[in-house]
Regions:
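Active-site beta-loop-alpha junctions enriched in small/polar residues
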Residues: 80-82, 113-115, 136-138, 176-178, ...
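Alpha-helix-loop-beta-strand connector modules within alpha/beta enzyme cores
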Residues: 89-105, 154-169, 222-246
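Local cysteine-cluster metal-coordination motifs and their immediate loop/turn environment
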Residues: 23-40
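Catalytic cores of alpha/beta
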Residues: 118-123, 180-197
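N-terminal [4Fe-4S]-dependent radical SAM core
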Residues: 1-22, 39-46, 65, 250
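Core AdoMet radical
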Residues: 19, 39-94, 98-119, 126-157, ...
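Auxiliary Fe-S-binding modules of radical SAM enzymes
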Residues: 1, 189-252
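Conserved strand-turn element in the central/C-terminal portion of the radical SAM core barrel
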Residues: 148-150, 160-187
Length: 252
């Protein structure tokens, strides 16, 4: 992963720094239009999907290695080479419990679609530190078009955000941004309302590498927006406490 694929998080593990990866799931309960680890038909995915589910002990051993030798370490469930980690929530739960038996500090993060609020609550109780939730849009209809949820709904995502926030966890949005959609005035208004409603701590601005004609054909066109930099600058003015970045931070 570190040498052939050039995965930055895999490199972090070997270079003893920052955020280490914890891929755990082979399956997913969404069919995102731009999935980077699994595609149907002739289109090739960027990554090969994880071929096995690790045991909690294996997850602990990787985390133990990273936490024992890195200052301000982060370990994250949910990677581009894997499916949705919450589909393996029992493995995650036991893994977090094992980690917290040895380490009271060190950030355990969950990159997720936040589809199972009951599992999110159990993980938070066990010692999860932070959660990064992926959305292509805060608008329900557009969310459904892109993510194609299977067996869950946008309401479940919102419930997970409420649960994690109520329990004092650090919440990031993994916002899949695309000029012509994210910067539209109606989308910005919905994003601002979303940030206020769920008290989001951080936006990770994830530039969506996708065919523009296919994407806008799926999501629909609208009035020309103000540009992504204008959106970011407006948010910095309106919500100065909101953090902006691209990677998961250490939160304790």
């Amino acid at each position: 992963c570190a040498l052939e694929y050039g995965c930055l998080e895999a490199q972090n593990l070997f270079l003893k720094r920052w955020e280490a990866p914890l891929p755990t799931s082979r399956s997913c309960n969404a069919q995102c239009f731009g999935c980077i680890s699994k595609q149907n038909g002739p289109v090739l995915a960027n990554h090969e999907r994880l071929a096995f589910v690790p045991t909690p002990q294996e997850v602990f051993e990787v985390t133990d290695l990273h936490f024992s030798r890195v200052e301000n370490p982060v370990a994250s469930f949910g990677q581009g080479c894997a499916g949705e980690p919450l589909t393996q929530w029992k493995v995650l739960l036991e893994s977090v419990e094992l980690i917290r038996k040895k380490y009271s500090k060190g950030t355990i993060n969950l990159n997720t679609n936040a589809s199972i609020p009951e599992a999110v609550e159990m993980l938070c109780n066990a010692g999860l530190s932070s959660m990064r939730v992926s959305i292509a849009s805060p608008t329900r209809e557009l969310y459904d078009r892109y993510h194609n949820p299977i067996g869950y709904s946008f309401d479940d995502v919102l419930d997970s955000l409420r649960v994690a926030k109520r329990m004092g966890k650090f919440i990031s949005l993994n916002l899949l941004v695309f000029p012509g959609l994210t910067d539209r005035q109606d989308e910005f208004a919905n994003l601002l309302e979303f940030l206020d409603e769920y008290d989001i701590d951080m936006i990770q601005w994830r530039n969506l590498n996708i065919d523009p004609e296919q994407y806008m054909g799926l999501m629909g066109t609208g009035p020309m927006g103000d540009g992504l930099m204008a959106v970011i600058e407006k948010l910095k003015t309106l919500k100065p406490q909101l953090r902006h970045g691209y990677f998961n931070p250490f939160v304790g």
